[in-house]
Regions:
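Short coil/turn segments at alpha/beta junctions that flank glycine-rich nucleotide-binding fingerprints
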Residues: 78, 95-98
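Conserved catalytic-core motifs of GNAT/GCN5-like acyltransferases
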Residues: 103, 116, 121-137
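Conserved acetyl-CoA-binding loop-helix of GNAT-fold acetyltransferases
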Residues: 77-90, 113-117
């Protein structure tokens, strides 16, 4: 059974391992840990007490910004990402958000399809948003909640 809980400090190392596993240009460890330390909302998904995914988001007034969401590859398409997204949307609504924003790599077709299943719409395209070894454009998406 999958369970969602708030991320705590003891989850950071495992969550960061998932980040490195699935993200072609993962956040630096410093930025990943700093996001938790500055108080961004962070939730994790577990299966039998094993951490298999996480979501990090910030809330400002009526806006939720999905900063990062990842599920270990062995759990892709098994409901963990959906449970994280459903929980994020529900928590955001409770906290007064009216809209969720995100940016996603233009070549990440699986993620774009996942977001479209939630009725996210494309708002804009940021050219050369992602730099480094895997440059890419960012698709800006939003969802009214």
């Amino acid at each position: 059974m999958l369970k969602i809980s708030l991320m705590d400090q003891s989850d950071l190392e495992l969550a960061y391992e998932i980040e490195k596993e699935v993200n072609p240009t993962p956040w630096s460890k410093k930025n990943f840990f700093s996001s938790f330390e500055v108080g961004h909302n962070s939730i994790v998904c577990r299966h039998e007490n094993n951490l298999i995914g996480f979501a990090i988001f910030s809330l400002v007034k009526e806006e939720c910004h999905l900063l990062n969401i990842a599920v270990t590859k062995s759990w892709h398409r098994k409901g963990a990402g959906s449970l994280l997204m459903n929980t994020l949307i529900k928590q955001s609504k409770v906290l007064g958000a009216k809209k969720v924003f995100l940016e996603v790599r233009s070549k990440n077709f699986n993620a774009i399809s996942f977001y479209k299943n939630y009725k996210f719409v494309q708002d804009a395209l940021r050219i050369n948003y992602y730099a480094g070894n895997n440059p890419d454009d960012a698709v800006m998406m939003s969802l009214d909640i």
